[in-house]
């Protein structure tokens, strides 16, 4: 499931992040890439040890966790502290699949990466290129969203970032271990949840709505890891 989540970050949060990142000490993104990805990764990344890395990551994480669409679609068990990257001057990231396990230096845990999320920090007009391309069983999807919006997709997806030929592309990225590891099951639960919310707006707590809600929770109970 690939999902556009609008308005994750508000204007003040975006301004704070952009101002802090403008003075950041970036490093070569290849330093954090795996054996396959290092050959195709040409970007800059904020080191985990940077002074503002954790507070900025926590700001993005809190914004996602308060967004109902993220909660419904990701069903988060553990959200890794968000990181930050920068593309400019031809920077790009070729086709790759994210590593199955990632460690969080701040939380002191390693998690299974079920869901990948990118939060865009500047507007599409600020740069040329830089599209996130996600390939799945339904085809090839090109993503370039307004500042503050996020895209959520399965971490199993083959994906890339096209070359940035003008300007600078800033983004935050993160992984989530979901309570439901299978993407198809997460997608079904998400659609059922959205249907229940729509029906509740029309029928309030009619018996049919209560019954569907019960089915949702019984499926979640059956499929959830914990």
UniProtKB/Swiss-Prot annotation:
Residues 78-178 form the Fe2OG dioxygenase domain. One of its GO terms (molecular function) is 2-oxoglutarate-dependent dioxygenase activity. The keyword Iron applies. GO terms for biological process: DNA damage response; intracellular iron ion homeostasis. Its EC number is 1.14.11.-. SMART domains: P4Hc (SM00702). Pfam families: 2OG-FeII_Oxy_3, PKHD_C. Fe cation binds at residues 96, 98, 159. Binds 1 Fe(2+) ion per subunit. 2-oxoglutarate binds at residue 169. Its cofactor is Fe(2+); L-ascorbate. Keywords: Dioxygenase, Iron, Metal-binding, Oxidoreductase, Vitamin C. HAMAP family: Hydroxyl_YbiX. This is PKHD-type hydroxylase HNE_2117. It comes from Hyphomonas neptunium (strain ATCC 15444).
